[in-house]
Amino acid sequence: MSDTPQLVVHRDKELMAEAAAARLITKIVDAQASRGSASVVLTGGRNGNGLLAALAGSPARDAIDWSRLDLWWGDERFLPEGDPERNVTQAQQALLDSVPLDPKRVHAMAASDGPYGSDVEAAAAAYAQELATASVPENHAAVPSFDVLLLGVGPDTHVASLFPEHPGVRETERTVIGVHGSPKPPPIRISLTLPAIRAAREVWLLAAGEDKANAVAMALSGAGEIQAPAAGARGRARTLWLLDSAAASQLPRSLYPPASA
């Protein structure tokens, strides 16, 4: 497990999105070259969608073999199919509808009008099973070994739909949970848990804007994961925080080098 996070601080959110997109393209291409395919977990929110939009506008996107890319989601709002607030809907608009993905490798979480109806626990269990099925048998793992797992960081330090002091952040056994009573609307969601997040080779946390500065400082200054879920999001090989200068404004300069982009 990567215990020491790496920080890269960019001048503004636009540069952060462009740089993160370039990093992601390189990571996907390298994974496909070495293992034949790549697996990425997407995140919603303004920073996650900003990254996808930057990727869509990058000429280098054509270096990716989109037919050999598995896409998963870290969380989802449990709303009807096509709802504009669903993360998958926003991802489709930002990027997915413009690239030649294999539909069988786009692993969206169930909608509230899908096969499980309003039963969010059944929908979460089904996604956990889909993850387990996709895992390489010899790894004996409950989830695939994601190449990159993207996470936005909320102003309260939440990641995915794991909120401070909420039951979901305390989950240690299941890989996917139904979230009830989310402090951020809508109240019902589906989320990966911290154990599932930590199965990723690399976890990249994205934060931009002054409203994220306190959360970033708290997560990187020794807070516990129950109080600051972002502090518990770590990759097996690498944990990377991609920030703009506003989000990094409350961090001591000793935490990141002056040469940050």
Swiss-Prot record:
It catalyses: 6-phospho-D-glucono-1,5-lactone + H2O = 6-phospho-D-gluconate + H(+). The keyword Hydrolase applies. Gene3D superfamilies: 3.40.50.1360. One of its GO terms (molecular function) is 6-phosphogluconolactonase activity. Pathway: Carbohydrate degradation; pentose phosphate pathway; D-ribulose 5-phosphate from D-glucose 6-phosphate (oxidative stage): step 2/3. Keywords: Hydrolase. GO terms for biological process: carbohydrate metabolic process; pentose-phosphate shunt. Belongs to the glucosamine/galactosamine-6-phosphate isomerase family. 6-phosphogluconolactonase subfamily. Hydrolysis of 6-phosphogluconolactone to 6-phosphogluconate. PANTHER family: 6-PHOSPHOGLUCONOLACTONASE. This is 6-phosphogluconolactonase. It comes from Streptomyces coelicolor (strain ATCC BAA-471 / A3(2) / M145).
